[in-house]
Amino acid sequence: PWAAKIAKALTLEKNKNNPPKTTIQLAELVSRTIPRRFHKNGFHPATRTFQALRIAVNRELQELELLLSSLSKNMLKGSRLAVISFHSLEDRLVKQTFRNWSQPCQCPPDLPYCICGLKPLGKVLTKRPCIAGQDEIENNLRSRSARLRVFEFARKTGD
């Protein structure tokens, strides 16, 4: 919800010939832009801004999509694919991909039976994502956002 305000603040600073030159300056600008009452305890207000920049620069979602597409064409029967995601955009992509692999039918829902002929590649083994327990989070703070999903291929793919 703050992207437009942050972008406007960056533009104003740029127009004043004073754009942020360091990550600390950018973090301070973001912190000033987001009202204090919206600062979450334990998280710097600029955390999501840096995350968004990293995701965009590294093309993380496109790369994950490419990887999943490639893997779906090269798996052996009985093989399992485990994916750990670290933010909701990645997790949503993995969840939707696994669902499409396990329920590929594209027939209209009002048809009494499937006529498209698409067969499932396998099944999702994790109904809900596995998350780190409290002990793991205490020992490894980064694990707090990790989500594990597993898919088992029921047939050889790529044929």
Spans of features found by a protein language model:
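S-adenosyl-L-methionine-dependent methyltransferase catalytic core, i.e., the SAM/SAH-binding region
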Residues: 1-159
